[in-house]
Amino acid sequence: MEKSLHLEIVTPDRLVLSEKVDYVGAPGYEGEFGILPNHIPFLSALNIGSLYYKAGGKTHWIFVSGGFAEVSDNKVTVLAESAERAEDIDLERARKAKERAEQRLAQAKEKLDSARAQAALQRAMARMRVRGAA
């Protein structure tokens, strides 16, 4: 039996991560799910939030802005709309994005404006949480 997984995180722009890991935790739409070596194959949609993995006794955090996770043959492939390692997140920029989203939400007149502002707020807050976990 395998004792590790290969985790690959890909966005439309780049390969964010490709490494051997011991565990992956990801933000699914029905809540967080975890993946250990020798997990059964499955495919899941990802919500905006914190993906984390354990490797070498350390926990590493990555912000993901939705996407999909596929598990098969001890490989976890994450196709994310965007992804940032915790150490790469500019906390001040995330705070400003949160403030802008809150202002837009307060001024939203249409449902579409409100939905966009809510999504922007959710992304900014998730980025701040991920950065704080690093």
From Swiss-Prot:
According to the record, the segments passing through the membrane are none
Q: Which family does it belong to?
A: Belongs to the ATPase epsilon chain family.
Gene Ontology molecular function, alphabetical:
ATP binding; proton-transporting ATP synthase activity, rotational mechanism
Per the record, membrane topology reads: Peripheral membrane protein
Q: Which GO terms describe its cellular component?
A: plasma membrane; proton-transporting ATP synthase complex
Keywords from the named record: ATP synthesis, Cell inner membrane, Cell membrane, CF(1), Hydrogen ion transport, Ion transport, Membrane, Transport
Q: Which organism is it from?
A: Nitratidesulfovibrio vulgaris (strain DSM 19637 / Miyazaki F) (Desulfovibrio vulgaris)
InterPro entries in UniProt: ATP_F1_dsu/esu_C_sf, ATP_synth_F1_dsu/esu, ATP_synth_F1_dsu/esu_N, ATP_synth_F1_esu_C, ATPsynth_dsu/esu_N
Residue stretches in coiled coil:
none
Q: Where in the cell is it found?
A: Cell inner membrane
Explain the purpose of this protein.
Produces ATP from ADP in the presence of a proton gradient across the membrane.
**Protein name stated in the entry:** ATP synthase epsilon chain
Q: How does it assemble?
A: F-type ATPases have 2 components, CF(1) - the catalytic core - and CF(0) - the membrane proton channel. CF(1) has five subunits: alpha(3), beta(3), gamma(1), delta(1), epsilon(1). CF(0) has three main subunits: a, b and c.
HAMAP family from the xrefs? ATP_synth_epsil_bac (MF_00530)
